[in-house]
Design a protein with these regions (language model features):
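C-terminal hydrophobic helical "lid"/dimerization subdomain
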Residues: 82, 98-102, 145-198
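A generic alpha-to-beta junction signature in SAM-dependent methyltransferases
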Residues: 13, 80, 91, 102-105
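Mid-domain Rossmann-like dinucleotide-binding core that forms the NAD(H)/NADP(H) cofactor-binding site
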Residues: 1-69, 74
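A short acidic, Gly/Pro-enriched loop at the edge of an enzyme's catalytic core
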Residues: 70-87
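Glycine-rich phosphate-binding loop and adjacent beta-alpha segment
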Residues: 94-158, 196-198
Length: 198
């Protein structure tokens, strides 16, 4: 739901647009899947090949391993011949936010989904002059209003979206605390689902 609102409403992603998603955890991979379903050419950026491979299986046309390049934003600029129409920071750390913003073309839209960590404490320095010179929009995104659930559910019903592709594993209620801790350490891929409440 969070990624649907970010892509369909706040990012206003359209058919044929270039969309780059920085940070391929559960939210980021969901954003890849949804942007692809909306007709975008999606680029996934992360540090881990396993997450990049998953992004490709969800529809990313290109991926960038940020640990293997000097400048992830420049890689995206090169892939898109000048920058993405829409960027997403699904992680919330300074590096991913700046890389996402710097991946945009003139007139691009940045969607901030990831909340910052304790290190950033809600503050990330941004290239303000670039926002002005390139007329970049910065948009926050949080959740999905219940009145808009039907849009997303219709895409699931018609097969454009398949949430089961995002499920990384099923876990018991006893495993939830450890999985939540692993998410805080960015040590998960996809979305674990609790299916055993006994």
């Amino acid at each position: 739901m969070t990624s649907y609102h970010a892509m369909a409403h706040r990012g206003d992603v359209g058919n044929g647009e270039d969309v780059v998603v920085h940070g391929l955890g559960g939210i980021g991979l969901s954003a890849v899947h949804i942007a692809n379903a909306l007709g975008a050419n999606v680029i996934g950026v992360d540090l881990f090949d396993e997450k990049l491979d998953k992004a490709e299986s969800l529809g990313a046309v290109e991926t960038v391993n940020a640990s293997e390049v000097d400048d992830a934003a420049k890689e995206v600029q090169d892939i898109t011949n000048g920058g993405a129409d829409c960027s997403v920071d699904a992680l919330g750390i300074e590096t991913t936010c700046l890389n996402a913003v710097n991946s945009l073309k003139k007139g691009g839209r940045h969607v901030q989904v990831g909340l910052t960590t304790s290190e950033e404490a809600g503050q990330v320095p941004l290239p303000t002059d670039e926002f002005v010179a390139k007329e970049i929009d910065f948009r926050g995104s949080l959740g999905l209003q219940p009145s808009r659930y039907s849009e997303m559910l219709d895409m699931i019903k018609t097969g454009k979206l398949d949430p089961t592709e995002l499920v990384s594993e099923t876990i018991s209620i006893d495993e939830v605390p450890d999985k939540l801790a692993a998410m805080s350490d960015y040590d998960t891929m996809g979305i674990p689902v609790c299916s055993d409440f006994s």
